[in-house]
UniProtKB/Swiss-Prot annotation:
Inhibited by 5-methyltetrahydrofolate monoglutamate and by 5-methyltetrahydrofolate pentaglutamate, inhibition is much more effective by the pentaglutamate form than by the monoglutamate form. Two molecules of 5-methyltetrahydrofolate are bound per tetramer. The binding sites are localized between subunits. Inhibitor binding may preclude movements of the polypeptide chain that are necessary for enzyme activity. Its main location: cytoplasm. Its EC number is 2.1.1.20. This is Glycine N-methyltransferase. One of its GO terms (cellular component) is cytosol. The lineage of its organism: Eukaryota, Metazoa, Chordata, Craniata, Vertebrata. It catalyses: glycine + S-adenosyl-L-methionine = sarcosine + S-adenosyl-L-homocysteine + H(+). PROSITE patterns: SAM_GNMT.
């Protein structure tokens, strides 16, 4: 494992199988504070996602990286039928708590939440009776949490195969990743605010790139987050944790997605929710892939 050469995660985080980088509980707690609730989502992101789903007539949505449930909650509140899964039980507990607290609301009583692994997603999540979900979403740089342990991206291909198998014919896959092209060429993330969250708790993010045999193998982000009420006499304290990501570049990830769809899909790429053109002046923080299954 790469942990023998370079510490990829905060101490206490699981290292076997599909890694749960939030398994120590502390990272999950601080992350929940950072991302906040649905009110912390940017208006641009909310309008874009809801508009996209409604434009394509999507009703049944599978969130394959729901984390604390912030996107799923937003979709449930907006009238979508949502199934939410994540590999981290420490993250899921926040979603489960929200469902319990709002169980008297019919939409939340019907909200399905399961622990699931991308490597066995086809077995963990029953496929919709309609042949799949209208839309499958994997947002917030979530897919990059999956490392390339074997060095051949076979885990990535299997995970994408399983994820795309959940999409019905005519349905959508919405999946994103950070602009790792820029990170690898400059050593730091593009400037600008997070396009997903309005949080003001982040004090610093330090970027590191791990290279193995002259190939970028991993990007780590060391977060320093201001946590209210944890310092001296109730003042804000600082919490630090590290998350590691596989650096998916735009061209190679596009190829992985097209292979997963077997060439049967309409594929568009956006940079920070706007149509992206290679060489454009604006450098996006995130690339968002929208694929429609046409088989």
């Amino acid at each position: 494992m790469v942990d023998s050469v370079y510490r990829t995660r905060s101490l206490g985080v699981a290292a076997e199988g599909l890694p749960d980088q939030y398994a120590d509980g502390e990272a999950a707690r601080v992350w929940q504070l950072y991302i906040g609730d649905t009110r912390s989502r940017t208006a641009e992101y909310k309008a874009w996602l809801l508009g996209l789903l409604r434009q394509h007539g999507c009703q049944r949505v599978l969130d394959v990286a729901c984390g604390t449930g912030v996107d799923s909650i937003m979709l449930v509140e907006e009238g979508f039928s949502v199934t939410s899964v994540d590999a981290s039980d420490k993250m899921l507990k926040y979603a489960l708590k929200e469902r319990w607290n709002r169980r008297h609301e019919p939409a939340f009583d019907k909200w399905v939440i399961e622990e699931a692994n991308w490597m066995t997603l086809d077995k963990d999540v029953p496929k919709s009776p309609m042949g799949g979900f209208d839309a499958v979403i994997c947002q917030g740089n979530s897919f990059a949490h999956l490392p390339d342990c074997r060095g051949d991206q076979s885990e990535h291909r299997l995970a994408l195969k399983n994820i795309t198998s959940m999409v019905r014919s005519g349905g959508l896959l919405v999946i994103d990743h950070r602009n790792y092209d820029h990170i690898l060429s400059t050593g730091c993330a593009p400037p600008g605010k997070n396009i997903y969250y309005k949080s003001d708790l982040i004090k610093d993010i330090t970027t590191s790139v791990l290279t193995v045999n002259n190939k970028a193998h991993m990007v780590t982000l060391d977060y320093t987050v201001q946590v209210p009420g944890t310092g001296h006499r109730g003042s804000p304290g600082l919490s630090k944790f590290r998350l590691s990501y596989y650096p998916h570049c735009l061209a190679s990830f596009t190829e992985l997605l097209q292979t997963a769809f077997g060439g049967n899909g309409q594929h568009s790429v956006l940079g920070d929710f706007k149509p992206y053109k290679p060489g454009q002046a604006y450098i996006p923080c995130y690339f968002i892939h929208v694929l429609r299954k046409t088989d």
